[in-house]
């Protein structure tokens, strides 16, 4: 796979930061060039998707940030090899031989949960820390777990870890209770190499989802309905 991560939409180009006021003194002509990096929120699920297909994947225009570096460490814990050179991130996922994403890494970035679906689909098992550790009550990832369970994954929570063993994912029809970018990406990746056809309703339609779908299709996936609230994914 050799893909370029797109720039974030104008309304997502900067992260909100607390400030009292931003004062701009206008009246001067502007000229020159500025380089806009790729969108972090698009890059992270694409990095996770490399787990689905053993081989060398080259991702271009990847922002070199703490989050992308942390996510690369998660992939390396699983057995992948990751290198950064400028905005090029190269991931060799052929050596993935572990299914455990440890708490010390996952706790620093919730997006680490993205490895759960690909691991279940490719390896038939996973042991991924809950982003918040062993917490009681509703969890931010409950929608992820509900969707994966609908695909046949028997998941348990053990000592703060999501654990799946001897998993064989199968296509299903699933409707999200609420729109979730993270859960949509999770089930898209899992369904890509699951057995049969998966239909997802009330999915997120953010640019991050479109980018992920386009990248997966470029790699041989069969995903229909990008830009709409229904995705049809034929397992390959």
Q: Over which residues does each language-model region extend?
A:
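Structural preference for solvent-exposed beta-strand-turn elements
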Residues: 1-236
